[in-house]
């Protein structure tokens, strides 16, 4: 069962075949999927980006 709960758009699969697309889920571990949008190169530890925006406090 997929433990992720992704918002409206995007897909998240935290199973054996981890895949994340435009994911906004909050339960997905960063080691599995980056929940930052594609425009963000790196997510800060424990950070979850919201929507399609990335704040400086979130991504580095």
Swiss-Prot record:
Where do the annotations place a divalent metal cation 4 binding?
32-33, 43, 47
Chain residue ranges for the region called Beta: 1-28
Q: Which residues bind a divalent metal cation 2?
A: 6, 12, 14, 25
Residues at which a divalent metal cation 6 binds: 36, 40, 43, 59
Q: Which residues bind a divalent metal cation 1?
A: 4, 6, 20, 23
- Superkingdom classification of source: Eukaryota
Segments of this protein annotated with the region Alpha: 29-60
- Quote the Gene3D superfamilies the UniProt record gives: Metallothionein Isoform II (4.10.10.10)
Does Metal-binding appear among the keywords?
A: yes
> Which keywords appear in this protein's UniProt record, sorted alphabetically?
Metal-binding, Metal-thiolate cluster
What job does the chain carry out? Metallothioneins have a high content of cysteine residues that bind various heavy metals.
Q: What is this protein called?
A: Metallothionein-2
* Organism of provenance: Cyprinus carpio
Lineage runs:
Eukaryota, Metazoa, Chordata, Craniata, Vertebrata
């Amino acid at each position: 069962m997929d433990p992720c709960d992704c918002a409206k758009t995007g897909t998240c699969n935290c199973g054996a075949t981890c895949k994340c697309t435009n994911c906004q889920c909050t339960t997905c571990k960063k080691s599995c999927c980056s929940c930052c949008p594609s425009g963000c190169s790196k997510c800060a530890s424990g950070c979850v980006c919201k929507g399609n925006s990335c704040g400086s406090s979130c991504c580095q």
